[in-house]
Amino acid sequence: MRFVLDTSIFVNPEIRRKFGDNPTEAMRTFLGYAEMLFGRVEFYMPPGIYREVMHFVDEDELLPEIELYIIKKPPNVHDIKIPAFVVYELIDDIRRRIDKGLRVAEKAVRESVIETDNVDRIIQKLRRNYRKALREGIVDSKEDFELILLAKELDATIVSADVGILTWAQKMGIKWIDAANFREVLEGLVAKMGEGKNL
């Protein structure tokens, strides 16, 4: 059994809380599960995701376990085939998002003409809504794309709370687990292993 891990498990406060009060504590708790499952379950991170996580944790507190239990592997970008429909969907999605972003900008301009004394507030609202229109639900970074490609290559399960990653995992037929449920999944795997059941 293989899992490809996203940063959201350790960084997103709502998700991380199940593992610990801060990213280092959350990673330490996860590594405890990884140790119990060692040899039966593999945990992967693409290098970009690993670097992101390392910005948030105290690496010295997690050595050597973090090196033992998390496999850092880039996807083989030269050999992975992506179906043409994925590119079509991506282009269509980007076009819809650009149009939606344009409507958000137009609305902000109209509001600023009416409320000239609240321009800063309107700009803040524009940025928030524009970001939401363009980025929510889409793979918006190279690191996110590497995560998806690696899971595809390994036939692994993605663990993430990122809506864009999970949406594209579904579109590409990749198994996934919402990071909000990951601790319970790990506990279930440890229990099955303790009972001598196959994973």
Swiss-Prot record:
InterPro entries listed in its UniProt record: PIN-like_dom_sf, RNA_free_RNase_P
What's the protein name? RNA-free ribonuclease P
Q: Name one GO biological process term.
A: tRNA 5'-leader removal
What would be an example GO MF term here?
Answer: ribonuclease P activity
User: What EC number(s) does its UniProt record assign?
Assistant: 3.1.26.5
The catalytic activity, as recorded, is:
Endonucleolytic cleavage of RNA, removing 5'-extranucleotides from tRNA precursor
What keywords sit in the KW lines? Answer: Endonuclease, Hydrolase, Nuclease, tRNA processing
Q: Which family does it belong to?
A: Belongs to the HARP family.
Keyword Cell division in the entry? The reply is no
Task performed by this protein = RNA-free RNase P that catalyzes the removal of the 5'-leader sequence from pre-tRNA to produce the mature 5'-terminus.
Whose protein is this, by species? Thermococcus onnurineus (strain NA1)
- PANTHER family, per the entry: RNA-FREE RIBONUCLEASE P, UPF0278 PROTEIN TK1425
> This protein's superkingdom?
Archaea
Recorded hits in Pfam families, A to Z, give: PIN_5
Q: What class of enzyme is it?
A: hydrolase
